[in-house]
Amino acid sequence: MSNYRRDFTKGGLYFFTIVLQDRTKSYLTDYINEFRSAYKQTCEHYPFETVAICILPDHIHLLMQLPENDDNYAIRIAYLKTQFTRQLPKECRQFNKNRQKYRESGIWQRRFWEHLIRDDKDLANHLDYIYYNPVKHGYVEVVKDWPYSSFHRDVKAEIYPEDWGGNPDLKIKGDI
């Protein structure tokens, strides 16, 4: 058993990877409006700043800035998962006995990857990783063509050029 201990830093900037249980499903993009609604509800109920996000068919990459006196990212992730699952059609929500016992939905992996951003270089690497991910997985050939990403917001803010190509060799811990 792993001795991994999660970091809890008040006001921390965290990178998350949140993954569907069945990686062959594309619920996150098939039901993008439901995801957006669940995300909005989560932000309203448990405020945080979205520094960057990329929604892929079977997983999400998210850079979340917590409020100054708050370290509870887990409640935000759990709430997002719950709200999205509730909005899915019933046939998508599969439950087995063990998951019912722990009040878990069958669509999500139980755990998620979390990483506290340490410095500006770490932040830049994670931003690049998030935005290049749809290209890495073969969903698009260029970053700007992926519609489910905050990349477009960052282009408008002149943080990234629209023709930014990414770094195909960039690897980060927790790469999926």
Curated annotation (Swiss-Prot):
Pfam families referenced in this protein's UniProt entry, alphabetically: Y1_Tnp
GO biological process: DNA recombination; DNA transposition
GO MF assignments: endonuclease activity; metal ion binding; sequence-specific DNA binding; transposase activity
Cofactors, names only: Mg(2+)
Keywords on record: DNA recombination, DNA-binding, Endonuclease, Hydrolase, Magnesium, Metal-binding, Nuclease, Transposable element, Transposition
Residue positions binding Mg(2+): 59, 61
Record-linked SUPFAM superfamilies: Transposase IS200-like
Catalytic residues as annotated in Swiss-Prot or TrEMBL: 148 (nucleophile)
Highest taxon listed in the record's lineage: Bacteria
Cross-referenced InterPro entries: RAYT_transposase, Transposase_17, Transposase_17_sf
Signal peptide bounds: none
Keyword Glycoprotein listed: no
Family: Belongs to the transposase 17 family. RAYT subfamily.
Function, in words: Transposase responsible for transposition an insertion sequence (IS) element. Transposition occurs in 2 main steps, excision from the donor DNA 'top strand' into a single strand circle and its subsequent reinsertion into the DNA target. This increases the copy number of the IS.
Subunit structure: Homodimer.
Protein name: Putative REP-associated tyrosine transposase
